[in-house]
Amino acid sequence: MTLLETIGIAAVTLHALLSAIYKSMQAFYARKASGSQPRSKDIDPAALPSVDIIVPCFNEDPAILSACLSSLAGQDYGGKLRIYMVDDGSCNREAILPVHDFYTSDPRFEFLLLSKNVGKRKAQIAAIERSCGDLILNVDSDTSIASDVVTLLVEKMRDSDVGAAMGQLKASNRDKNLLTRLIDMEYWLACNDERAAQARFGAVMCCCGPCAMYRRSALLLLLDQYQTQLYRGKPSDFGEDRHLTILMLSAGFRTEYVPEAIAKTVVPDRMGSYLRQQLRWARSTFRDTLLALPLLPSHNRFLTLDAIHQNIGPLLLAVSSATGITQFILTATVPGWTIIIIASMTMVRCSVAAYRSRQIRFLAFSLHTLINLFMLIPLKGFALLTLSNSDWLSRGSTTDGPAIAESNAASNEAEIVASASPFGGGTSWRFRR
């Protein structure tokens, strides 16, 4: 046995052992907890917290934006609800203004039109400073939420120790092609395996941007840190959802996952868009993992194992894959042990997912292993080597995935040039920050 074979076998075996331990514990903790909270419908509406929904938007497709706003208007929530749609200097503003106009007669809606593109994070903050609700729900402009999402998330936020809660994400364009079907299954696993297990300890590590609720009092404490995130002295403009979640945990708040709160978001339908999205996410994950490390000792040991698996696992898989390919090129011999282990792990994972979800389609998720091995793992390596790069790598297409249409164009000042809120009698107003 050559040194190359030994390294490959050792790496893939260690990866298999790590994954077996981690996935077993994850499946155990991801089980649905018993017990239920009182439904908000059974509570006096006057006692319910007020909720502000914030929707940042940049160059969104009018039909997709209309579906988003329609789902917000249809929320079955007994408490006070306000909806702030922030247009972040869209180039297609003329095309989306008719969508705004359709809701101007609804007193719950207010439209903030930024004169220039400032990026998703600053667009959110513009609305946060304008709003006053007890709870803030962030919804991406390419996302539609079920009618009970606000109610379900508010129920989880009734615990004052909870600083943030997210719903379950699904792909609204799942049936478009094979890639969107795989991404939809990837989302299911990310939510109902990873987030569900983390939520058992009140420490969801990323409350995903398309549908996440925050406690205003907690958010205001963290707003300066959120707004001025730096990495190696440079502004960090993406991964805002993960960063804000880590800030919540650092401040001592719990972060939760509510699987019944369903949000459907547009996912990439082209491989190039998907890889650009994954590159941004990989960079933000690596950056905020460093920020999260000091938190791990104060939480259950499973979360430390989770961090190890998320970061060391891909490294072991990369080593085993690279040595296997090199072995085949140099010696024309097939790395049989590596192939058997990876194939076995894939089938076990997909079979467990099919059983837990009661959906046989998850057996087809084995195809995603090829994408992971030959595209995502090298991409993560590139992300690690280019952590200082904060480019969004987006052309503004709405098919680039959740929230990726927003640009990271830098600007320290934003001007709100108009409001479609009927409270102002249709009069334009301005303010600067």
Swiss-Prot record:
<dbReference type="GO" id="GO:0005886">
    <property type="term" value="C:plasma membrane"/>
</dbReference>
<keyword id="KW-0808">Transferase</keyword>
<protein>
    <recommendedName>
        <fullName>N-acetylglucosaminyltransferase</fullName>
        <ecNumber>2.4.1.-</ecNumber>
    </recommendedName>
</protein>
<dbReference type="GO" id="GO:0050501">
    <property type="term" value="F:hyaluronan synthase activity"/>
</dbReference>
<keyword id="KW-1003">Cell membrane</keyword>
<comment type="function">
    <text>Involved in the synthesis of Nod factor, a sulfated N-acyl-beta-1,4-tetrasaccharide of N-acetylglucosamine which initiates a series of events in the host plant species leading eventually to nodulation.</text>
</comment>
<dbReference type="GO" id="GO:0085029">
    <property type="term" value="P:extracellular matrix assembly"/>
</dbReference>
<dbReference type="InterPro" id="IPR001173">
    <property type="entry name" value="Glyco_trans_2-like"/>
</dbReference>
<keyword id="KW-0328">Glycosyltransferase</keyword>
<dbReference type="InterPro" id="IPR026463">
    <property type="entry name" value="Chitooligosach_Synthase_NodC"/>
</dbReference>
<dbReference type="InterPro" id="IPR029044">
    <property type="entry name" value="Nucleotide-diphossugar_trans"/>
</dbReference>
<keyword id="KW-0472">Membrane</keyword>
<comment type="similarity">
    <text>Belongs to the NodC/HAS family.</text>
</comment>
<keyword id="KW-0536">Nodulation</keyword>
<dbReference type="GO" id="GO:0030213">
    <property type="term" value="P:hyaluronan biosynthetic process"/>
</dbReference>
<dbReference type="Pfam" id="PF00535">
    <property type="entry name" value="Glycos_transf_2"/>
</dbReference>
